[in-house]
């Protein structure tokens, strides 16, 4: 009996060691698993949607499921983000976001500038800005940040002159000189493309010009360039801006793959801003 005791002790130690090894293996396996996180991002149209689709596959490797929420107008994405229905949005420039914050007590914040949408003036019947006759109607977007943007573009090319102001945005009240007596008709951003046949000229982004078969390089009477604050930007909220999923999304959207995609497919209309 005494001889059996040491043998039993050894057997217990062996079994205990096996049990510990299995537990450690299970723990390591569990720790090795990446918990999947769903990140919802509101957006509107290409190339915004396409850039997010490119980011999807890269985020999958980090255990992040990117849910692209395509909405129908330029109001819903900010409302959805403000109300915490989505985690981020990708459709706007920073002045547009700032105006939303001001009017809605919002806490939206820019994460990363992705590309410049080369703003321009387009006209069906005229090939140069100088050809547009006196008293003509030029359609511009009706939200304050894009009124400002349109007027700055026109001043940049000497079409109008704006008076100095301490206000955040230029409006039509700040037009000091309008030598051709142009009438600037303010319409909803999503209506600009429809105004191409009705107005003498339209000021709009490439995203709305492209369905009409127009590009800034080939058809823009004047264009904006990249020296401005109007890059299309990834936006989140102050409470989640520094979170790992949002930062991973930023990295995925500023990859070499995204840059190459824009250069290959949107060289005239979406200029990388990163």
Language-model features, listed with the residues they occupy:
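Short, well-ordered beta-strand elements
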Residues: 34-46, 64-70, 137-138
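C-terminal motif of bacterial Sec signal peptides marking the signal peptidase cleavage site
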Residues: 13-17
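Short helix-initiation/N-cap motifs at beta->coil->alpha
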Residues: 68-79, 167-194
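Ligand-binding "clamshell"
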Residues: 99-111, 126, 198, 203, ...
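A bilobed periplasmic-binding-protein/Venus flytrap-type ligand-binding module shared by bacterial periplasmic
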Residues: 118-130, 231-243
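Bacterial signal peptide processing site
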Residues: 19-22
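Periplasmic-binding protein-like
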Residues: 148-155, 253-273
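Alpha-to-beta junction loops
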Residues: 82-92, 136, 159, 180-183, ...
């Amino acid at each position: 009996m005494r001889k059996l005791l040491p043998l039993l002790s050894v057997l217990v130690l062996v079994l205990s060691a096996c049990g510990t090894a299995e537990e450690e293996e299970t723990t390591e396996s569990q720790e090795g698993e990446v918990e999947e996180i769903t990140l919802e991002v509101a957006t509107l149209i290409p190339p915004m949607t396409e850039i997010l689709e490119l980011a999807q596959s890269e985020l999958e490797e980090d255990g992040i499921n990117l849910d692209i929420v395509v909405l129908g107008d330029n109001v819903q994405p900010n409302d959805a983000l403000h109300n915490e229905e989505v985690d981020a949005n990708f459709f706007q420039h920073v002045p547009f976001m700032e105006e939303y914050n001001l009017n809605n007590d919002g806490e939206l914040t820019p994460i990363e500038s992705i590309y410049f949408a080369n703003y321009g003036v387009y006209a069906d019947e005229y090939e140069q800005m100088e050809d547009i006759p006196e008293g003509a109607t030029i359609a511009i977007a009706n939200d304050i940040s894009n009124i400002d943007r349109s007027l700055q573009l026109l001043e940049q090319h000497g079409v109008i002159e704006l008076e100095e102001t301490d206000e955040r945005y230029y409006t039509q009240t700040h037009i000091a000189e309008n030598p051709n007596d142009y009438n600037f008709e303010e319409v909803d951003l999503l209506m600009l493309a429809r105004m191409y046949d009705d107005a003498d000229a339209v000021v709009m982004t490439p995203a709305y010009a492209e369905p009409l078969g127009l590009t800034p390089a080939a058809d823009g009477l004047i264009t904006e360039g990249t020296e401005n604050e109007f890059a299309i930007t990834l936006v989140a909220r102050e409470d989640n801006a520094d979170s790992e999923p949002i930062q991973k999304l930023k990295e995925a959207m500023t990859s070499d793959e995204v840059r190459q995609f824009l250069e290959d497919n949107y060289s005239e209309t979406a200029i990388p801003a990163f």
